[in-house]
């Protein structure tokens, strides 16, 4: 073997150590043993020629030569294989090929038990452990178990706050590379996932799957407490907190807790004064996107009646107007079976009815009567003297004690 390390003298140039010797000692094992030896032997059908030399029968290439070259790249950080889609670089061409499957949505490795597909064979191996019930990787912080080391690594970033994947357009960071790829589509406008029913397109496959449930009516996430069901897993997780009372998102300024992260973000704007949603017509700003949308209707007159061509700024006004055409009166008074178009008319009728009813609560000082005890207590504040003579007992009483001794008219 002429090119077998040049008589064992080819070395890792940066560290000045013989590669095969260090491989035997167990050093550099992170990359040499786990990465090179394990994968090359499995993928390239490596055979051992002697105690130090391995050769790939498929490609007729010397194993130690490649091992030395790859070891050097780990120290020099040389990554000659570049992805044309996202500019990410790799040490091995095989890593680039696996990575490109993410962009091409190619998942050639399919699980025989659940037909779930994966873009890398190692991801499939980790997934298959979930069927076997094996989870080898445990988080030191919270004790959660994972079937793949990559899943554990991503999970640990939730504790450390590490977000190594940076968007070069807006400097936003992500803990997963797949989230970065999806985020980039917001800049490019790319929506590669299309619904076959309505041809609506989406930037992420999960969004497409959730959308398709609007056509099928499928609600796979069911609550075992109240039997409510949801199309989206995220909505299901939020709902479960209604039963558990869990509020995992705490405000650092006032320690108020919230069940949803979005509610915490909106709340924090109370402390910061941030109003990120700006109207381009009048430059007015809002803390919530919903408030901006409602405000924008004042400029566009979004809600228009087709019968009279009348426009409304507010959806609630538009709904009330439509009831005129439909002769719909949703507010019903149970005592007289009268129907009302507007809620405020309903409230007014309740007040009128109350005026004709018997007055139950009488104040013995001035003989005024009231429908409710709360109204009687409020009336007592009109009398500014601290003490009155009760006309029933002729004793001096302060207002607080006198309130309890006023009689209810039968």
Curated annotation (Swiss-Prot):
Modified residues (Phosphoserine): 400
Function (record text): Transcriptional activator. Important for maintenance of pluripotency in embryonic stem cells. Binds directly to the POU5F1 distal enhancer and the NANOG proximal promoter, and enhances expression of both genes. Can also bind to numerous other gene promoters and regulates expression of many other pluripotency factors, either directly or indirectly. Promotes inhibition of MAPK signaling during embryonic stem cell differentiation.
Organism: Mus musculus
Superkingdom of this protein's organism: Eukaryota
Cross-referenced InterPro entries: Znf_C2H2_sf, Znf_C2H2_type
Subcellular location: Nucleus; Cytoplasm
Sequence similarity: Belongs to the krueppel C2H2-type zinc-finger protein family.
Biological processes annotated in GO: positive regulation of stem cell population maintenance; regulation of DNA-templated transcription
Subunit annotation: Interacts with POU5F1.
This protein's GO CC annotations: centrosome; cytoplasm; cytosol; nucleoplasm; nucleus
Protein name: Zinc finger protein 322
Note: Significantly enhances POU5F1/OCT4-SOX2-KLF4-MYC (OSKM) mediated reprogramming of mouse embryonic fibroblasts into induced pluripotent stem cells, and can also substitute for SOX2 in this process.
Keywords per UniProt: Activator, Cytoplasm, DNA-binding, Metal-binding, Nucleus, Phosphoprotein, Repeat, Transcription, Transcription regulation, Zinc, Zinc-finger
Main subcellular location of this protein, as a coarse class: nucleus
C2H2-type zinc finger segments: 81-103, 109-131, 137-159, 165-187, 193-215, 221-243, 249-271, 277-299, 303-325, 361-383
Lineage: Eukaryota, Metazoa, Chordata, Craniata, Vertebrata
GO molecular function: cis-regulatory region sequence-specific DNA binding; DNA-binding transcription factor activity; zinc ion binding
Stored PANTHER family: ZINC FINGER PROTEIN (PTHR24381), ZINC FINGER PROTEIN 37 HOMOLOG (PTHR24381:SF390)
């Amino acid at each position: 073997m002429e090119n077998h390390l040049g008589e064992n003298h080819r070395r890792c140039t940066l560290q000045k150590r013989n590669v095969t010797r260090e491989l035997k000692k167990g050093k550099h094992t992170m990359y040499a043993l786990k990465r090179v030896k394990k994968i090359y032997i499995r993928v390239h059908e490596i055979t051992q020629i002697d105690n130090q030399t391995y050769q790939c029968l498929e490609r007729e290439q010397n194993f130690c030569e490649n091992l030395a070259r790859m070891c050097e790249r780990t120290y020099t950080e040389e990554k000659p294989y570049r992805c044309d889609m996202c500019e990410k670089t790799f040490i091995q061409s095989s890593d680039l090929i696996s990575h490109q499957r993410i962009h091409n949505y190619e998942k050639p490795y399919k699980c025989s038990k659940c037909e779930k597909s994966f873009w890398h064979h190692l991801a499939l191996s980790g997934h298959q452990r979930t069927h076997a019930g094996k989870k080898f990787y445990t988080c030191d912080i919270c004790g959660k178990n994972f079937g793949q080391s990559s899943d554990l690594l991503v999970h640990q970033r939730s504790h450390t706050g590490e977000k190594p994947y940076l968007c070069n357009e807006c400097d936003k960071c992500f803990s997963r590379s797949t989230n970065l790829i999806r985020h980039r589509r917001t800049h490019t406008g790319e929506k590669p996932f299309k619904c076959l029913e309505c041809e609506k397109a989406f930037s992420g496959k999960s969004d497409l799957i959730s959308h398709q449930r609007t056509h099928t009516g499928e609600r796979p996430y069911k609550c075992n407490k109240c039997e409510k069901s949801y199309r989206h897993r995220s909505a299901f997780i939020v709902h479960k907190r209604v039963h558990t009372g869990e509020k995992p998102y705490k405000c650092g300024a006032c320690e108020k807790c919230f069940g949803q992260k979005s509610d915490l973000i909106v709340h924090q704007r109370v402390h910061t004064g941030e109003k990120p949603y700006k109207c381009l017509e009048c430059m007015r700003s809002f803390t919530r996107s919903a408030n901006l949308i409602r405000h924008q209707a004042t400029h566009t007159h979004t809600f228009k009646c087709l019968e009279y061509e009348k426009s409304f700024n507010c959806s609630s006004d538009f709904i009330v107007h439509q009831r005129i055409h439909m002769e719909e009166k949703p507010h019903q008074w149970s005592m007289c079976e009268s129907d009302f178009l507007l809620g405020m008319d309903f409230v007014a009728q309740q007040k009128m009815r109350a005026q004709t009813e018997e007055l139950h609560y009488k104040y013995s000082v001035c003989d005024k009567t009231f429908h409710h005890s709360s109204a009687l207590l409020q009336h007592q504040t009109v009398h500014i003297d601290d003490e009155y003579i009760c006309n029933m007992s002729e004793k001096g009483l302060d207002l607080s004690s006198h309130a309890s001794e006023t009689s209810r008219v039968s």
